[in-house]
Amino acid sequence: MAKLQLGYKASAEQFGPRELVEIAVAAEAAGMDSVAVSDHFQPWRVNGGHAPFSLAWMAAVGERTERVKIGTSVMTPTFRYNPAVIAQAFASMACMYPDRIFLGVGSGEALNEYATGFQGEWPEFKERFARLRESVRLMRELWSGEISNFDGDYYHTKDAVLFDIPERPVPVYIAAGGPVVAKYAGRAGDGMICTSGKGMDLYTEKLIPAAKEGAELGGRDFDALDKMIEIKISYDPDPELALENTRFWAPLSLTAEQKHSVNSSAEMERLADELPIEQVAKRWIVASDPDEAVAAVKQYTDAGLNHLVFHAPGHDQRRFLDNFQRDLEPRLRALG
């Protein structure tokens, strides 16, 4: 099994760019192995929402830190972005911060794409997944340093060359919510990304077996695949605060269909705020006892997930990081 790693989710929907950089620096000081940032053009909330540009943030964090891996969780390199330009951006960052940059990719949400000019009906999963696969092929072709004349169904290059490429290609992590994409992650990804709180059967019966099948079909070492999961955790010694902190992230409790098709932050916020706090909290590990919190996390390592990226919902992230370093990190390291 791949090495146990502990990471921090930098919530770009909740914090402005400067504050989020400083929090990432604090996360490294608290012992985190990685920091992963979301990439939204529009946040899920109008009130209190933010949407700093992930690539600018990553470069700033690279300059301010020394060892943490830095990446997206996740970016959609298929609609508002040209994948060739994303390949250039990540190649440049990987040159500046060797072996510290990774690219996490997903198939996209309408919220970010309509705001930046997408027109027509939001594509079905089949097209979005096809675009994603094609974009990954194109980016890897460019990272080879060879001349690219890519002629795909969606993307094209003509005599394109990246003149600054890292010694080793940028690792690509594939976000998987179901077995179809998990199989692709196993076959073609350097890592797989999923999120917690969706019932253990999803991980043990669908995602992990599908990723393993994909790796076997591709003749790859499944154990070498970095299996990342965003752990939604609201840990605080104050149980009332641990529960109430989840409120800001009520949009996570909407269905995938709602999140993928809603095209305005105001509508997303309206739908989310109609949910009772008990339903909102179901997506989270809500705990004030460290042993209870770690026992809940252990389910995921037992399932075979090795890279745990912790997403804390509260507005006081330094409080969470202090609590994490004191109460949770020693117990979590013992799992590996």
From Swiss-Prot:
Known function: Catalyzes the coenzyme F420-dependent oxidation of glucose 6-phosphate (G6P) to 6-phosphogluconolactone.
Protein name in the entry: F420-dependent glucose-6-phosphate dehydrogenase
Uppermost EC category: oxidoreductase
Residues involved in substrate binding: T195, K198, K259, R283
Entry keyword annotation includes Oxidoreductase: yes
Highest taxon of the lineage: Bacteria
GO biological process: carbohydrate metabolic process
